[in-house]
A protein has these predicted regions:
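Bacterial N-terminal signal peptides that target proteins for export
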Residues: 57-65
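Short pre-active-site segment immediately N-terminal to the catalytic Zn-binding motif
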Residues: 534-552
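Bacterial N-terminal signal peptides
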Residues: 66-74
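Short His/Asp/Glu-rich catalytic/ion-coordination signatures at enzyme active sites or charged loops
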Residues: 96-111, 160-179, 201-243, 303-343, ...
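N-terminal helix-rich structural modules
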Residues: 21, 80-287, 714
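C-terminal, non-catalytic "cap/extension" segments appended to globular domains
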Residues: 83-106, 118, 299-301, 431-433, ...
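Active-site-proximal, well-structured secondary-structure segments within enzyme catalytic domains
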Residues: 214, 218, 250, 257, ...
Length: 765
């Protein structure tokens, strides 16, 4: 959930406020003013990194991390001037909290829209001042001024979009609908501001060769960002791109709202406890709680999560109920009426294809991939085809084995259906390994996993320490806040965790930030993770499945990428890297969950007992039990994404043809398999249609290869050695996008190119 991007083309910098900034330039983060806050943008691309379990992170819209890649950020509250000297809006005045943390005790839903509009107005003024300047353009008066503009808007929007994703009430949704067109217009106005671009180009032409290090990188990213956004196009083409950007923004906002409503509406109501046979008492209690929170149309409710398959099917004995749950998931938003998202899909696909063509590319995929490590669609397909070749025969064997096992109890004519797979796979695992989820789950208390697992691993590897800050307010009572310090005790960041699901939170898991690290701004990071774990009834401890344990480690890997950043400029810091690199730190961090010394430290039951060695051995053996499903669902989703992005604008199917197109596309690559469907079907593929992963979902597999190579290098050098962690931190995690990422990868691993065999080996294939 790498929340993971286009940069904020806007930043506010008025000379009058330089004095204010200086007043706070030497702050003590423990007591006063803070670092900045990150936002999201494409206009405002939300800088959110999604977990594969999510639906991530955000672009003008909700794009997590987008094609253009640099994420925007904002200065800390204390460093950010208010829009007016007399305002009482808490979003427009400096925070007095540690690190400049958002003061959620004072912020009301009604504050967001006026604050956003005031910040937009201020940003326009700052950009116009740069564009209309009569001074000869220089790195300082143009590039740094541009980098420093928009701090107020970044601050306000980062807070708003966090709440918009995690606690979307009707009033918040209305604010999003009202503000997105204004943000899109602002982004377009900046992208196509000819005077501004001429100044940027002048600096690029006259100073690029003279600059070094991060200064040179910053200039290059800003200049190329303008070019990729259409600054060199004719006036007619600029106008059309502007129209496309506006329409896509509207469609993504509509998509997000509609999909959340569709998913909430897809709840499966259950009339009796007997129908829930097979579920644990805790799961049944959760179904009862979910029913009460959704109007209690029946005593129990099964809530649909964002992915195609639903984890609850693993233990649900009632086959007809399993079918109902699966069909509710698959068809949540592909029917007729208000929840059908396919008309949005086809319109957005056509607009993206047209934009790619206007920019001079054959399709949107070619345009989108140019700024990534993969670079071209051909390279992506070569990568995918090699994986499919190894995967396909193993997948067929895996499915046949599960069906054969089911027929032992159900009879020789039993036909395995997709809603049966998790159920019989789990029974087969228990029979072969004598292991069930119910045996291991009591050892994964959510607090222990976080403190004794996730935090402990970061302490062992990077020397980090964590102290809960109960004095800092949050936007929801379920959240926790931690101050992060290094091995010397020096505070370096704040970390917020929001782990439990609720009706107002969209599905999935992600990372983003209220503030990104920047030495130029004397700014420390304020990072957050959001997940959707089930919460136990009040007064009882909550427990995680193994998949959820790895999700927590995954999202904290993104968080570490932000926490350990050590860059000059906020545009280049932290997770502001191509999306096919940004998922590497998160996927790599998952590997610590199963390292014995870490595992033994957090896998403890309510009696304080560690997981028995025999049970632990079986659980570790089960991690790669039947590995094809997880790989196959990702391959299928990736190929569906690429199929849409490869189409020219003249070949986009209609809404009624969309499902057939998806099936035919999967059939062409050997992935049309009812037993292993895509992780997300098109109609609810939020990464692609609501986020920034169009032509980019391959990034999860691509970065898994990088992560597996990194993990093997750690194993060789000493997985828990501080020297290994410090080297990884210095060469990769702290560097943001200030270095050549392939060179950084090679420097740490000693490999000239990533070795894809590592992925197959780690998955047991």
């Amino acid at each position: 959930m790498p929340r993971k991007r286009k940069k904020t083309h806007v930043l506010i910098f008025l000379a009058f406020y330089q004095t204010i900034w200086k007043l706070f330039s030497n702050f003590d983060p423990r007591h006063a003013t803070p670092p900045a806050t990150n936002v999201t943008i494409v206009v405002i691309q939300r800088n959110i990194l999604y977990n594969n379990e999510s639906t991530m992170n955000t672009k003008i819209k909700k794009t997590l991390l987008t094609v253009g890649l640099s994420s925007s950020v904002m200065l800390s509250m204390a460093q950010t001037p208010s829009a007016t000297a007399t305002t009482t809006n808490p979003l427009l005045i400096p925070s007095t909290l540690s690190y400049g943390a958002p003061d959620f005790n004072r912020i009301k839903a009604s504050d967001y829209l006026p604050a956003l509009e005031a910040a937009i107005a201020q940003q326009r003024k700052a950009i116009n001042a740069i564009a209309e300047s009569k001074q000869t353009p220089t790195f300082r008066n143009t590039i740094l001024a541009y980098e420093n503009s928009g701090k107020l808007l970044d601050r306000v929007s980062s807070i708003f979009f966090c709440v918009d994703e995690a606690d979307k009430t009707p009033e918040i949704a209305a604010t999003e609908k009202a503000i997105m067109p204004q943000l899109t217009q602002l982004d377009n106005d900046i992208s196509f501001n000819e005077k501004l671009f001429h100044r940027v180009k002048y600096v690029y032409d006259h100073e690029f060769a003279k600059l070094k290090g991060e200064d040179r990188r910053l200039l290059e990213e800003i200049y190329k960002g303008f070019v990729r956004n259409g600054a060199l196009l004719s006036k007619e083409k600029k106008t059309r791109v502007e129209q496309i950007n506006k329409r896509i923004s509207d469609l993504q906002q509509q998509w997000g709202t509609q999909l959340q409503e569709a998913t909430n509406n897809a709840v499966v109501w259950v009339n009796s406890k007997e129908e829930l046979a097979g579920l644990s008492d805790a799961d049944i209690a959760q179904c009862e709680k979910d029913a009460q929170s959704r109007g209690a149309k029946a005593p129990y409710a099964i809530v649909i999560i964002n992915t195609t398959q639903q984890p609850i099917l693993t233990n649900l004995d009632n086959r007809d109920l399993r079918r109902r749950v699966y069909e509710a998931s698959v068809h949540r938003s592909d029917g007729t009426g208000r929840y059908n998202t396919l008309p949005i899909v086809v319109e957005m696909a056509k607009l993206r294809a047209e934009k790619g063509e206007i920019m001079g590319y054959h399709n949107y995929a070619a345009y989108s991939l140019e700024k990534t490590m993969a670079q071209t669609p051909e390279n992506v397909y070569t990568f995918l085809n090699n994986l499919i070749k190894a995967y396909r025969p193993n997948a067929d064997k895996e499915t046949a084995a599960i069906e054969a096992y089911a027929r032992q109890t159900m009879g020789p004519d039993f036909q395995l259906q997709p809603y049966d797979r998790f159920y019989y796979s789990a029974k087969m695992k228990k029979a072969q390994l004598n292991l069930s989820e119910d045996e291991v789950k009591p050892y994964f208390n959510i607090d222990s996993v976080q403190v004794n697992g996730v935090f402990y691993a970061a302490h062992r590897v990077y020397g980090l320490n964590f102290k809960e800050r109960k004095d800092l307010p949050t936007y929801h009572a379920d959240m926790k806040v931690f101050e992060v310090s290094d091995s010397t005790g020096k505070p370096i960041a704040l970390f917020y965790s929001d782990y439990f699901r609720r009706p107002t939170k969209r599905g999935g898991a992600w990372m983003s930030s209220f503030a990104k690290q920047s030495k130029a701004w004397n700014q420390l990071p304020i990072i957050y993770n959001v997940c959707n774990f089930a919460q136990a009834p009040e007064g009882q401890p909550s427990y995680l499945t193994w998949d959820e344990v790895t999700t927590m480690f995954h999202e904290f890997g993104h968080a570490l990428h932000g926490i350990l950043s050590n860059c000059q400029y906020n545009t280049l810091s932290g997770t502001a890297v191509p999306r096919d690199f940004v998922e590497m730190p998160s996927q790599f961090n998952e590997s610590f969950a199963s390292i014995p010394e870490i595992f033994n430290h957090y896998a403890i039951n309510s009696r304080g007992e560690h997981m028995p060695e025999a049970l632990k051995a079986k659980m570790m053996e089960s991690i790669n039990f039947q590995p094809c499903y997880a790989l196959g669902e990702n391959l299928a989703a990736t190929c569906a994404d690429m199929a849409w992005a490869m189409l020219p604008s003249s070949a986009i199917p209609t809404a009624t043809q969309a499902t057939t197109f998806e099936q035919e596309s999967l059939k062409k690559v050997g992935l049309l398999d009812s037993q292993i469907p895509p992780r997300y079907f098109t109609s609810y593929f939020n990464h692609v249609w609501g986020g920034g992963y169009a032509a980019g979902y391959y990034s999860y597999l691509w970065t898994e290869v990088l992560a597996d190579n990194i993990a093997m290098t750690f194993k060789q050098k000493g997985a828990l050695k501080r020297t290994t962690g410090d080297e990884f931190r210095d060469k990769i995690l702290s560097r943001g996008y200030t270095v050549d990422l392939m060179k950084a990868f090679s420097s740490f691993t000693g490999l000239q190119q990533p070795d894809a065999q590592a992925l197959l080996k780690m998955r047991g294939l």
